[in-house]
From Swiss-Prot:
Gene3D superfamilies given in the database record: 2.40.50.100
Disulfide bonds: none
Organism whose genome encodes this protein: Sulfurisphaera tokodaii (strain DSM 16993 / JCM 10545 / NBRC 100140 / 7)
Designated name of the protein: Probable glycine cleavage system H protein 2
Record's cofactor remark: Binds 1 lipoyl cofactor covalently.
Record gene name: gcvH2
Function statement: The glycine cleavage system catalyzes the degradation of glycine. The H protein shuttles the methylamine group of glycine from the P protein to the T protein.
InterPro entries, per the entry: 2-oxoA_DH_lipoyl-BS, Biotin_lipoyl, GCV_H, GCV_H/Fam206, Single_hybrid_motif
GO cellular component terms given for this protein: cytoplasm; glycine cleavage complex
SUPFAM superfamilies for the chain: Single hybrid motif
């Protein structure tokens, strides 16, 4: 795992990076991904106080929200890294939103999706390319990641 300015960047994950929006996807099967926000995103948001997840069965286009989040300094959507259908949600983050801050790559996962076209996942960045892109964002925002 890469660590840049205290921000953890697991190189085995796939990343959807659009401006300051950084979402990770973990492939569980060729057409199934688990989705969450990065350490960078949770640091930029600050303490997350509310998470609203789209319902199971919701069809989502790439870049459209799978969830919305609110913190003291930010409210906004969490974009889908690929088009597909939400097949599972993490009820724990709705009850205890700070999990997103405490464990963004583990207990703070948001939704599980069945991807329409697994080829679409090839558009996401991973490995050293992801570390490089996310390092640029960390540096441009002068970030020091921290967990709550």
């Amino acid at each position: 795992m890469a660590n840049v300015s205290n921000c953890e960047i697991p190189e085995n994950l796939l990343y959807f990076i659009e401006g300051k929006n950084t979402v990770w996807a973990k492939q569980e099967a060729p057409d199934v991904i688990v989705v969450g926000i990065t350490d960078i995103a949770q640091t930029m948001a600050g303490k997350v106080v509310k998470v609203r997840l789209k319902k199971k069965g919701t069809k989502v286009e790439r870049g459209k929200p799978v969830a919305t989040m609110e913190s003291g300094k930010w409210a906004g959507p969490v974009p889908a890294p690929a088009s597909g259908e939400i097949i599972d949600v993490n009820p724990d983050v709705e009850k205890n939103p700070v999990l997103v801050n405490q464990d963004p790559y583990g207990k703070g996962w948001l939704v599980k999706m069945k991807v329409n076209n697994p080829e679409e996942l090839k558009q996401l960045v991973t490995g050293s390319a992801a570390v490089s892109k996310l390092t640029e964002l960390i540096n441009s925002e002068k970030l020091q990641c921290k967990r709550l």
